Amino acid sequence: ALANVAALLAKWGRKVLVIDFDLEAPGIEKYFDSSLSSLNSFRNTVPGIIDLIYSFIGSKKEKLSWKDCIIKCTSAHFRKELSIITAGRDDGNYISKAQNLNWDKLFNENDFGNYLETMRKEWIKEYDIILIDSRTGITDIGGICTIHLPDVVVLMFTTNDQSLYGIKDVIERARKQHETLPFDRSTLLAIPVPSRDESRTEYEASSRWKKKFSKELSELY
């Protein structure tokens, strides 16, 4: 869904940045048609989010910039450029790097929050729309994507109670934490989106679920 939205926005003339923050299950670049660009091969050599983090906490004076991580996806259909920052360089060490990240230390000892905020401001100046692919559920990485970085959280869910009440819990927690951020932020907006519409085949069940969605999620919008 995120890749489709990104492509449509670029087609409509918006300058778009897509960021893969799903570090545990990376690969947003695979959803873009390989005929548009060599995105899969680029990930073997071009750094991404994981590499930015390790550069930030590393001892080298020359630090990576997020601009060093940009992969441009080009198409004759796009009126503006579509840029991608992948989860990280796929060089054989990615999994161990992702597993060894200490998020508490990053934020509490390395001032990672201010580093993120600086990048966030630069992204906003450079692009019309920034779309961030997040890990599902309540995780350290998910907190970055639902609390620290976004102005709007799009919550994809399915027609079952676990999914419905799960996204409700996620956004309620995110809003509480969002209000405590030491940065200037407007109210965190939420857009719940059911990922499947089965009204054509299961009309009555679909109608019941839509009523339930409206009732349970009315506080979100």
What are these regions (language model features)?
Residues 23-122:
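P-loop/Walker-type NTP enzyme "switch/lid" segment
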Residues 1, 5, 58-76, 146-153, ...:
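Solvent-exposed, charged interface segments at domain starts and junctions
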Residues 1, 94-95, 200-204:
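A generic structural signal for short coil/turn motifs at secondary-structure boundaries
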